[in-house]
Amino acid sequence: MSTITPSELKTSLADPGWIPWPLYRLTLDQYEAMVASGVFSGRERFHLINGFLVAKMTKNDLHATADELCGDALGGTIPDGWHVRAAKPIRIPSQASKPEPDRCVARGSIRDYLQRSPEPTDIALVVEISDSSLSEDRKQAAIYAAGGIPVYWIVNLVDRQVEVYSDPSPLGYRSRQDYHAGESIPVSIGGNQLSSIALNDILP
């Protein structure tokens, strides 16, 4: 395990300043109204990140396998009163964002979210599986941190490690720890330390 100091966690949101014409940012309410009205009912798949519509990336077989392994590992660890969600929207009002992370540990049962999406107060952990999306997933840490997501994992398939971001602040996560093959990742849900997950159980 290696520890990264806060000075090494300088992540920032995308800067659209190079675009030569004005951009329009959607509010979260506007985006949700568009979804409800069927604007995105075609083949296009988007989610809202920092007020912008961002196309969702297609998952290859390696990504899909790591996603399933991670879901199985988390499902065998979390306590009663929580559940693991897969590629479902979460709502981050303060960041005008409604991403759909690969995995999310949310409070309560599946049926609790029939008419709403989990918000940061409902969420213990967000996980993104990263291969070609590694740079974007690292930048997205800034949104998760500012929005109040307690812990963010990046399952980094490029370097075969899991990056664990914690201690969120408006400027980003204050802590990052990297876990490598042969190590185990401690799992904390709702402030309670649970058993660890072996990295080898997550990486394909």
Where are the language model's segments positioned?
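Gly/Pro/Ser/Thr-rich low-complexity, intrinsically disordered segments predominantly at protein N-termini
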Residues: M1-P204
